[in-house]
Amino acid sequence: MQETRNKRQIIILLVLLACIVLALTFSPGRSSFDVPPDYYREFNLREVDRVEMKSAGKDVSLNFNNSRWQVNNEFSADRGLVEVLFATLQQAEPKRRVASSMRDSLTRVLREKGVLVSLFNGENKAGAFFAGGNAAKTQAYFLKEGDDQPHLMAIPGYRVYVSGIFELPAIQWREKLIFDLNWTNFRKLETNFRNPAGNFTVEMARNQAVIPGVAEPDTARLNTFLDDLSLLRADEYLERTRALDSMSQSQPLAEYQISDIGGRVYSLRVYDYDDKFLGLTHAGQFAVLPREHLIPLLRPKEFFIKR
């Protein structure tokens, strides 16, 4: 009797064990059949010094050069966007495999219309994958180069379109800081308005900003003005068009020209642009400028005279 009871308990335990194994195998949690979370980051990001993002006619190359990232070896990259790029590479994880019914078609789309993201350490390729998504930009997919199984991607805890950072055109990678210079080398600022009576110049004299012709300037206002100018950032850059080129031939609302002790000149011409402002930089780029940040920079000369 006892022996029969023991056998029955053993059978029950074996059945329970089998159920546990099956539950673990087919549960929604990770199993041996799931793709590992680091499947698309099998590289050391600290060693990456070049990132190439290639798509149809929109190649972008980010190179680390002399403590700064450069875009296509033409201009400095926006530091904030570079941080977003590396955060995406570090945190993006496969959420699940793409269903077999759409695997082949999505693989073809990613290879033909997606962005090929390649990471390098010197001349050595550390990794590469295709990035893309649906038309609504609500679902992102990655496909490792040489593979035929795409994955739906996500950043745990966030609802973002993961592939968006890889799809930016080169112009949007440009440093958004308008006057990207070492302000300790500042020598002179010339500010001109449509009404010449408001024009003024700022120079450095004994390590202090002064306005020639103004015996006693309001230093608090002047220093705030210079701080605001040094921190002015573009919301975005625009590709050149005939309409923008035509606008640039008209008289600007304001023009700022900064020179440093090395003889380099940085300029900005400002125009009305819908509910914002449009700036034309010394590099010939059209920049959309936030209205709330530019209005304080339209102060005329008399504003800085101490009362």
Name these PLM-found stretches.
Residues M1-R307:
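Secondary-structure "cap/kink" motif recognition
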